[in-house]
Amino acid sequence: MNAFEYANPVRVIFGAGTFSRAGEEIAKLGKKAFIVSYNDNSVSVTLEKLTALLSTAGVESTKFLQVTPNPPIEMVAEGVVQAKEFGADVVVGVGGGSAMDAAKAIVAGILYEHGDLWNMVYASHSNVTAKPPEKALPIFLIPTLPATGSEMNMCSVVSSSTLQKKSYIWADCLFPKASILDPELTYTLPPFQTACGGVDSISHVLEIFVNGQADSDLLHEWQLGVIKTIVKNLPIALKNPTDARARTELMWSATCGINGWASPGDAWTPMHQVGHVLTSRYGINHGSSLAIIMPAWMAYFKKIKPAPYERFEKEIMSIPEFKKFISECGLPVSLSEKGVKEEDIPLIVAGVKDVSFNADGVLFSNPPVTEEMLAEILKLAL
């Protein structure tokens, strides 16, 4: 196992019914809560209950409901303005990855001292000019869609509508002070969102498993265990959305997949880098982009680096079966399903290169991915 240093300060309040503690827990962090979420019926009841809980706890609140998928930095900037006008001393993110990541970007933006908020973003891996935030107001997260693991990590993924780019902010000050993970909040998720979250959760761990260190029994068992848990419980939750056990397993698996436990000493996200371009340029939902890329990536690299893929096939399912599993969950498994054609591949490769290729001209992967290799993978994904 590689040497590593690990610290995660997030206090997690987990379990059915724990949402009822939101008011008292947020009151420990501040008295003016700026709630960041969507203007959507899927969270409206939760937001009403949260406002009441905060009021009972003596916390004044206001809602910022302008979050959209793949939160644009322009929206983040507006949130910063409104949070300052309100005099917020704590920010609360409620929803899936977009809401939580927007809340993180806003909470950092309020105190940001390096100009344009896009300066926070690692927008080029080959020419790193990002000035990540050094301080932020307290942030409290309440996920309603298990997927990104934002509730227990230091990352925020945002986009630029102007630049057609999607990348991340990475800073210690983005760790939430605390998060409530109540599986009951996921019961009303639409099936498509449930499936997207499950596939995104799988991808976080799969990327570490196939790219990371090859000599750790513990990490491999942990990684495969998370994937097996999601593969088992995702179809159950899709069939019966109020299955408490399945929803609980999916929620904790999503968190554990990207809070550092499964990947100490490793940081591999090449499939995500491709997915970000599919999202920013073609509007493909994040989970769908990974549903498309994963099977093609696996099929390509099994021929080059067979060991991890053969173990995946032995312990979970074959790559063709995995592709079928994703499709049966209701997600696309080919670029053509989303209107992407072979002639678009050079543009996609150029987009990935622009943001995610290192200074040595390859995508950070194990083995490294060249432009030519990426083009071949995308052809398999057609």
Positions of PLM-derived features:
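Acidic-glycine-rich active-site phosphate/pyrophosphate-binding loop
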Residues: 77-80, 173-179, 227, 265-272
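C-terminal charged capping/lid subdomain of soluble metabolic enzymes
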Residues: 314-382
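Short Gly/Thr/Asp-enriched flexible loops that form oxyanion-binding sites at enzyme active sites
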Residues: 80, 99-113, 152-153
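A glycine/threonine-rich phosphate-anchoring loop and its flanking beta-alpha core
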Residues: 10, 112-215
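Active-site segments that bind and position negatively charged phosphate/pyrophosphate groups
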Residues: 208-324
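Glycine/serine-rich anion-binding loops at beta->alpha junctions
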Residues: 88-104, 144-150
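ATP/NTP phosphate-donor binding region
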Residues: 1-90, 335
